[in-house]
Protein backbone atom coordinates (compact mmCIF):
# COMPACT_ATOMS: atom_id res chain seq x y z
CA UNK A 1 0.00 0.00 0.00
CA UNK A 2 0.88 3.66 -0.15
CA UNK A 3 2.23 5.62 2.79
CA UNK A 4 1.93 9.35 3.38
CA UNK A 5 3.85 11.13 6.10
CA UNK A 6 3.43 14.67 7.39
CA UNK A 7 5.30 16.65 10.00
CA UNK A 8 3.25 18.58 12.50
CA UNK A 9 3.72 20.72 15.55
CA UNK A 10 1.71 21.63 18.64
CA UNK A 11 1.08 25.23 19.65
CA UNK A 12 -1.76 27.34 20.94
CA UNK A 13 -2.51 30.84 19.76
CA UNK A 14 -5.26 33.41 19.88
CA UNK A 15 -5.84 36.89 18.51
CA UNK A 16 -7.24 39.31 21.05
CA UNK A 17 -8.86 42.66 20.14
CA UNK A 18 -6.99 44.38 22.98
CA UNK A 19 -3.77 42.37 23.38
CA UNK A 20 -3.05 41.35 19.79
CA UNK A 21 -1.41 38.00 18.98
CA UNK A 22 -0.88 35.56 21.84
CA UNK A 23 1.26 32.43 21.41
CA UNK A 24 1.21 29.64 23.99
CA UNK A 25 -0.38 31.95 26.53
CA UNK A 26 2.11 34.80 26.12
CA UNK A 27 1.96 38.04 24.19
CA UNK A 28 3.83 37.60 20.91
CA UNK A 29 3.64 40.77 18.79
CA UNK A 30 3.87 39.90 15.09
CA UNK A 31 6.14 42.04 12.96
CA UNK A 32 7.24 40.93 9.53
CA UNK A 33 6.94 41.10 5.79
CA UNK A 34 4.67 40.28 2.89
CA UNK A 35 6.66 37.94 0.63
CA UNK A 36 6.25 37.20 -3.06
CA UNK A 37 7.65 33.96 -4.47
CA UNK A 38 9.57 35.66 -7.25
CA UNK A 39 13.14 36.28 -8.39
CA UNK A 40 14.74 38.07 -11.32
CA UNK A 41 15.73 35.49 -13.92
CA UNK A 42 13.74 32.72 -12.23
CA UNK A 43 10.21 34.07 -11.96
CA UNK A 44 8.18 31.91 -9.59
CA UNK A 45 10.39 28.85 -10.25
CA UNK A 46 12.76 29.72 -7.44
CA UNK A 47 15.13 27.17 -5.97
CA UNK A 48 15.32 25.93 -2.40
CA UNK A 49 18.58 27.88 -2.02
CA UNK A 50 16.74 31.07 -3.01
CA UNK A 51 14.03 30.30 -0.44
CA UNK A 52 16.67 29.81 2.24
CA UNK A 53 18.28 33.12 1.28
CA UNK A 54 14.90 34.87 1.58
CA UNK A 55 14.37 33.34 5.00
CA UNK A 56 17.84 34.31 6.20
CA UNK A 57 17.25 37.94 5.21
CA UNK A 58 13.82 37.99 6.85
CA UNK A 59 15.16 36.56 10.11
CA UNK A 60 18.17 38.89 10.04
CA UNK A 61 15.86 41.91 10.12
CA UNK A 62 14.14 40.55 13.22
CA UNK A 63 10.85 39.48 11.63
CA UNK A 64 8.74 36.71 13.14
CA UNK A 65 5.84 36.58 10.66
CA UNK A 66 5.40 36.37 6.89
CA UNK A 67 2.34 37.02 4.78
CA UNK A 68 2.59 34.71 1.76
CA UNK A 69 1.21 37.00 -0.92
CA UNK A 70 -1.04 36.52 -2.76
CA UNK A 71 -1.22 32.86 -3.75
CA UNK A 72 -0.11 29.36 -2.85
CA UNK A 73 3.62 29.11 -2.14
CA UNK A 74 5.97 26.15 -2.47
CA UNK A 75 5.74 23.37 0.12
CA UNK A 76 9.47 23.71 0.73
CA UNK A 77 8.94 27.24 2.02
CA UNK A 78 6.14 26.20 4.37
CA UNK A 79 8.51 23.52 5.70
CA UNK A 80 11.17 26.17 6.21
CA UNK A 81 8.70 28.36 8.12
CA UNK A 82 7.81 25.40 10.35
CA UNK A 83 11.50 24.81 11.08
CA UNK A 84 12.23 28.46 11.86
CA UNK A 85 9.10 29.10 13.92
CA UNK A 86 7.77 31.86 11.68
CA UNK A 87 4.04 32.67 11.93
CA UNK A 88 2.34 32.54 8.52
CA UNK A 89 -0.65 34.22 6.85
CA UNK A 90 -1.57 32.07 3.82
CA UNK A 91 -4.02 33.33 1.21
CA UNK A 92 -5.59 32.68 -2.18
CA UNK A 93 -5.15 34.74 -5.40
CA UNK A 94 -8.45 36.62 -5.09
CA UNK A 95 -7.15 40.12 -5.69
CA UNK A 96 -8.24 43.67 -6.58
CA UNK A 97 -11.30 42.85 -8.71
CA UNK A 98 -14.16 40.43 -8.17
CA UNK A 99 -14.99 38.55 -11.36
CA UNK A 100 -18.63 37.66 -11.95
CA UNK A 101 -17.75 34.15 -13.13
CA UNK A 102 -14.89 33.54 -10.70
CA UNK A 103 -16.74 32.31 -7.59
CA UNK A 104 -16.18 28.59 -8.20
CA UNK A 105 -12.49 29.17 -8.82
CA UNK A 106 -12.03 31.07 -5.56
CA UNK A 107 -13.64 28.20 -3.63
CA UNK A 108 -11.42 25.65 -5.36
CA UNK A 109 -8.35 27.76 -4.57
CA UNK A 110 -9.33 27.96 -0.89
CA UNK A 111 -10.02 24.23 -0.64
CA UNK A 112 -6.67 23.36 -2.22
CA UNK A 113 -4.78 25.86 -0.06
CA UNK A 114 -6.18 24.41 3.16
CA UNK A 115 -6.16 20.72 2.25
CA UNK A 116 -2.55 20.93 1.09
CA UNK A 117 -1.29 22.92 4.06
CA UNK A 118 -3.36 22.45 7.21
CA UNK A 119 -0.71 20.27 8.88
CA UNK A 120 1.84 23.10 8.84
CA UNK A 121 1.94 24.54 12.39
CA UNK A 122 3.43 27.78 11.07
CA UNK A 123 0.10 28.81 9.52
CA UNK A 124 -2.04 30.97 11.81
CA UNK A 125 -4.65 32.50 9.49
CA UNK A 126 -6.29 31.86 6.12
CA UNK A 127 -6.66 34.94 3.91
CA UNK A 128 -9.88 35.33 1.93
CA UNK A 129 -8.79 38.11 -0.44
CA UNK A 130 -6.47 41.06 -1.00
CA UNK A 131 -7.69 44.61 -1.75
CA UNK A 132 -10.73 43.10 -3.43
CA UNK A 133 -12.68 46.37 -3.27
CA UNK A 134 -9.98 48.36 -5.08
CA UNK A 135 -11.78 47.79 -8.39
CA UNK A 136 -15.05 46.21 -7.24
CA UNK A 137 -18.19 47.54 -5.59
CA UNK A 138 -19.24 46.11 -2.26
CA UNK A 139 -22.43 44.44 -3.45
CA UNK A 140 -24.29 41.30 -2.47
CA UNK A 141 -22.40 39.14 -4.97
CA UNK A 142 -19.05 40.16 -3.49
CA UNK A 143 -20.31 39.69 0.05
CA UNK A 144 -21.78 36.27 -0.75
CA UNK A 145 -18.51 35.11 -2.31
CA UNK A 146 -16.63 36.09 0.85
CA UNK A 147 -19.22 34.44 3.09
CA UNK A 148 -18.86 31.24 1.08
CA UNK A 149 -15.06 31.36 1.36
CA UNK A 150 -15.26 32.08 5.08
CA UNK A 151 -17.67 29.19 5.67
CA UNK A 152 -15.54 26.82 3.60
CA UNK A 153 -12.39 27.74 5.51
CA UNK A 154 -14.13 27.10 8.83
CA UNK A 155 -15.55 23.80 7.58
CA UNK A 156 -12.19 22.53 6.35
CA UNK A 157 -10.20 23.91 9.28
CA UNK A 158 -12.12 24.96 12.40
CA UNK A 159 -8.85 25.55 14.27
CA UNK A 160 -7.69 28.68 12.44
CA UNK A 161 -9.28 32.12 12.02
CA UNK A 162 -9.89 33.81 8.69
CA UNK A 163 -8.74 37.26 7.67
CA UNK A 164 -8.53 39.56 4.65
CA UNK A 165 -6.35 42.47 3.56
CA UNK A 166 -8.47 45.54 2.86
CA UNK A 167 -7.50 48.46 0.66
CA UNK A 168 -7.18 51.82 2.43
CA UNK A 169 -10.16 53.35 0.57
CA UNK A 170 -12.60 50.86 2.11
CA UNK A 171 -14.74 52.53 4.77
CA UNK A 172 -14.42 50.94 8.18
CA UNK A 173 -18.22 50.66 8.34
CA UNK A 174 -18.32 48.37 5.28
CA UNK A 175 -20.30 45.14 5.82
CA UNK A 176 -17.50 43.09 4.26
CA UNK A 177 -15.44 43.70 7.42
CA UNK A 178 -18.00 41.71 9.40
CA UNK A 179 -17.24 38.48 7.52
CA UNK A 180 -13.70 37.33 8.51
CA UNK A 181 -12.74 36.50 12.08
CA UNK A 182 -10.01 39.14 12.17
CA UNK A 183 -9.38 42.15 9.95
CA UNK A 184 -6.40 43.90 8.47
CA UNK A 185 -5.77 46.95 6.29
CA UNK A 186 -3.24 47.89 3.63
CA UNK A 187 -2.32 51.52 4.31
CA UNK A 188 0.24 53.68 2.54
CA UNK A 189 -0.25 57.05 4.24
CA UNK A 190 3.07 58.80 4.16
CA UNK A 191 4.11 57.29 0.86
CA UNK A 192 1.54 57.14 -1.95
CA UNK A 193 -0.55 59.83 -0.31
CA UNK A 194 -1.11 61.74 2.90
CA UNK A 195 1.04 62.06 5.99
CA UNK A 196 2.58 59.53 8.34
CA UNK A 197 0.34 60.52 11.25
CA UNK A 198 -2.71 59.42 9.26
CA UNK A 199 -1.70 55.81 9.94
CA UNK A 200 -1.89 56.50 13.67
CA UNK A 201 -5.24 58.24 13.25
CA UNK A 202 -6.68 55.37 11.21
CA UNK A 203 -5.97 52.72 13.83
CA UNK A 204 -7.09 54.96 16.69
CA UNK A 205 -10.38 55.64 14.91
CA UNK A 206 -10.96 51.99 14.00
CA UNK A 207 -10.17 50.69 17.48
CA UNK A 208 -12.33 53.32 19.16
CA UNK A 209 -15.31 52.46 16.96
CA UNK A 210 -14.81 48.68 17.04
CA UNK A 211 -12.97 47.83 20.28
CA UNK A 212 -14.08 44.20 20.09
CA UNK A 213 -12.68 43.59 16.60
CA UNK A 214 -9.14 42.49 15.87
CA UNK A 215 -7.28 44.75 13.44
CA UNK A 216 -3.91 44.31 11.74
CA UNK A 217 -1.61 46.17 9.37
CA UNK A 218 -1.29 43.84 6.36
CA UNK A 219 0.69 46.10 4.01
CA UNK A 220 2.66 49.31 4.26
CA UNK A 221 5.95 50.65 2.97
CA UNK A 222 7.92 53.33 1.14
CA UNK A 223 10.05 52.69 -1.94
CA UNK A 224 13.66 53.85 -1.97
CA UNK A 225 16.94 53.74 -3.85
CA UNK A 226 19.86 53.18 -1.44
CA UNK A 227 21.95 55.48 -3.62
CA UNK A 228 19.61 58.39 -2.80
CA UNK A 229 20.30 60.11 0.51
CA UNK A 230 18.90 63.40 1.77
CA UNK A 231 19.57 65.83 4.60
CA UNK A 232 15.91 66.88 4.35
CA UNK A 233 14.02 63.69 3.47
CA UNK A 234 10.41 64.06 2.36
CA UNK A 235 7.64 61.89 0.97
CA UNK A 236 8.14 60.99 -2.67
CA UNK A 237 11.87 61.69 -2.88
CA UNK A 238 12.74 57.96 -3.12
CA UNK A 239 15.62 58.44 -0.70
CA UNK A 240 16.74 55.80 1.76
CA UNK A 241 16.75 58.60 4.31
CA UNK A 242 12.99 59.07 4.00
CA UNK A 243 12.45 55.32 4.02
CA UNK A 244 14.23 55.19 7.38
CA UNK A 245 12.05 58.02 8.74
CA UNK A 246 8.97 56.17 7.48
CA UNK A 247 9.81 52.83 9.11
CA UNK A 248 10.92 54.42 12.37
CA UNK A 249 7.54 56.14 12.56
CA UNK A 250 5.66 52.91 11.82
CA UNK A 251 7.52 50.92 14.45
CA UNK A 252 6.81 53.59 17.06
CA UNK A 253 3.15 53.73 16.02
CA UNK A 254 2.82 49.95 16.29
CA UNK A 255 4.68 49.68 19.61
CA UNK A 256 2.20 52.11 21.19
CA UNK A 257 -0.82 50.09 20.00
CA UNK A 258 -0.59 46.50 21.29
CA UNK A 259 -4.01 45.68 19.84
CA UNK A 260 -2.57 45.65 16.27
CA UNK A 261 -2.29 41.89 15.87
CA UNK A 262 0.30 41.89 13.06
CA UNK A 263 2.31 44.16 10.77
CA UNK A 264 3.56 43.07 7.34
CA UNK A 265 5.78 45.35 5.27
CA UNK A 266 4.74 45.27 1.60
CA UNK A 267 7.56 44.07 -0.66
Question: Which residues fall in each region the model found?
Answer:
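Short acidic active-site motifs
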Residues: 76, 171-172
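Active-site-adjacent substrate/metal-binding segments within catalytic domains
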Residues: 2-147, 162-163, 209, 215-218, ...
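Short, internal active-site loops enriched in acidic
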Residues: 131-132, 168-170
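Substrate-binding clefts and catalytic carboxylate motifs of secreted carbohydrate-active enzymes
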Residues: 122-126, 144-167, 173-267
Amino acid sequence: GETETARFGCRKFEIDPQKGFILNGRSYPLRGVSRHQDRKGAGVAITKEMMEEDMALILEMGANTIRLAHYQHAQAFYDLCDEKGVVIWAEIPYITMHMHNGRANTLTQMEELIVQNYNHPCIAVWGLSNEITAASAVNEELLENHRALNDLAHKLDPTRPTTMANVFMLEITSPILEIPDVNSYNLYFGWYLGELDQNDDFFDTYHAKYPDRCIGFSEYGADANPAYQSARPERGDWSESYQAVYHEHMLKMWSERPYIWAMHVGI
